[in-house]
From Swiss-Prot:
<dbReference type="Pfam" id="PF03684">
    <property type="entry name" value="UPF0179"/>
</dbReference>
<comment type="similarity">
    <text>Belongs to the UPF0179 family.</text>
</comment>
<dbReference type="InterPro" id="IPR005369">
    <property type="entry name" value="UPF0179"/>
</dbReference>
<protein>
    <recommendedName>
        <fullName>UPF0179 protein Ta1159</fullName>
    </recommendedName>
</protein>
Amino acid sequence: MITLPKISLIGSNIAKEGLEFVFAGPLAACSDCRVKNVCFNLEQGHRYRVTKVREQVNPCIIFNGDKVNTVEVEELEDYVNVQESKRIQEGAIITLKSMNCDYITCPNIEKCNLYYFKPDSKVMVKSIGKEIKCPKGYKMKQVAITYK
């Protein structure tokens, strides 16, 4: 079975093979764009890596330079920080909940507050990683996840 690559659009000024990014989701300003379906072909909160930059360029009112390139992307394994719990086991399906932490200088804040994930996303715990040092004293673990 042949698997077709995922296609999206990304600003021409940053379109390079190997670039990793998190798709933050669709923007309201893009609602009238003729190629928006290609841009929004990705899942909000998922991490991707550009595997190929194609020559096709399209106009864009959002990106600096007003141009976007067509790119092929692959989805990457993602990591989040969760509170330690007996429910957190490899293979378990969990619902992601933001910690809503206000410790803004913490280097882990994005992985604890889950800024880029849809609320209440269901994921499978692929593996349990290292303990995270939480400045607020929570017992946190880094977990690798796959999307359900």
